Regions:
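Solvent-exposed interaction patches of small proteins and small membrane subunits
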Residues: 1-109
């Protein structure tokens, strides 16, 4: 197993963890519960960092995968920094990463 496959397995693991954390909960729950919201943020950060470590070769080979999904959601209005509100973080944690990455990443490994 190569380095990218290990990274992708970790991303899949983090997405599964997010799925468990957000299951049957809405944005309001996380807005009112800082420790649970921090769990989502932690996993989203780990996924973003892991996505950035995947080699360009793999990213080019699997160009159907949006490797920048987190960066795209986190860009501020000036497109120079990163910020996420509760809604963006919840959306990433509860559905976007599962819908946009999970199956495609499973095809890679």
């Amino acid at each position: 197993m190569n380095k990218d496959e290990l990274i992708i397995k970790n991303i899949i693991k983090y997405i599964n963890e997010l799925d468990l954390i957000t299951k049957d909960k809405d944005k309001t729950f996380f807005f009112d519960n800082t420790s649970e919201f921090n769990k989502i943020i932690n996993r989203v950060i780990k996924i973003g960092e892991s996505l950035s470590k995947v080699s360009d070769e793999t990213k080019n080979k699997y160009s159907n995968i949006n490797w920048n999904i987190i960066k795209e959601k986190a860009l501020d209005e000036e497109k120079v920094g990163y910020e996420m509100n509760v809604k963006d973080t919840y959306d990433l944690g509860s559905k976007l990463l599962k819908e946009e990455l999970y199956e495609k990443l499973n095809e890679v490994i």
